[in-house]
């Protein structure tokens, strides 16, 4: 593959929205034969094994649910756009989702890896949403 092809590939990857990028990572991990849960899960497991029987260290949580808790009224449009970027919702569905009362899962049943959850949380908070991770 030439450097021009690689540059084009990098540009296309950088243009992906967050959800598409996550799907790409999962497909690459699957293609390369990484264990379920990805490379970070195997690195974490190796780190835990190296601690030995010296103590029962609490396992760090690796999967998170992104909870949408609300938004700043003056940032409604930006929040709707951010929700659309982070989900596969259309404009009307994203608007309805944002306008619902109470705390709810961003994508019902979806568990994010820590880095991805933090990225989604930051994107939504930058837009004006109140978000928590569970």
From Swiss-Prot:
GO molecular function: mRNA binding; structural constituent of ribosome
GO terms for cellular component: ribonucleoprotein complex; ribosome
Biological process (GO), any one: translation
InterPro entries from the UniProt entry: Ribosomal_bL12, Ribosomal_bL12_C, Ribosomal_bL12_C/ClpS-like, Ribosomal_bL12_oligo_N_sf
SUPFAM superfamilies linked to this entry: ClpS-like, Ribosomal protein L7/12, oligomerisation (N-terminal) domain
Keyword list, A-Z: Ribonucleoprotein, Ribosomal protein
Stated family: Belongs to the bacterial ribosomal protein bL12 family.
Listed HAMAP family: Ribosomal_bL12 (MF_00368)
Protein function: Forms part of the ribosomal stalk which helps the ribosome interact with GTP-bound translation factors. Is thus essential for accurate translation.
Subunit-structure text: Homodimer. Part of the ribosomal stalk of the 50S ribosomal subunit. Forms a multimeric L10(L12)X complex, where L10 forms an elongated spine to which 2 to 4 L12 dimers bind in a sequential fashion. Binds GTP-bound translation factors.
Protein name, as recorded: Large ribosomal subunit protein bL12
Native organism: Anaplasma phagocytophilum (strain HZ)
Gene: rplL
């Amino acid at each position: 593959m030439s450097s021009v092809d690689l540059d084009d590939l990098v540009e296309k990857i950088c243009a992906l929205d967050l959800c598409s990028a996550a799907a790409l990572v999962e497909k690459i991990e699957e293609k390369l034969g990484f264990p379920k849960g990805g490379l970070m899960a195997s690195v974490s497991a190796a780190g835990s094994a190296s601690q030995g029987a010296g103590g029962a260290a609490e396992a760090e949580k690796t999967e998170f649910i992104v909870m949408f808790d609300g938004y700043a009224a003056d940032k409604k449009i930006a929040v709707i756009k951010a929700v659309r970027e982070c989900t596969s919702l259309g404009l009307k569905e994203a608007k309805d989702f944002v306008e619902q009362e109470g705390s709810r899962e961003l994508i019902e049943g979806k568990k994010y890896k820590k880095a991805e959850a933090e990225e989604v949380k930051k994107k939504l908070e930058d837009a004006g949403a109140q978000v928590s991770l569970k």
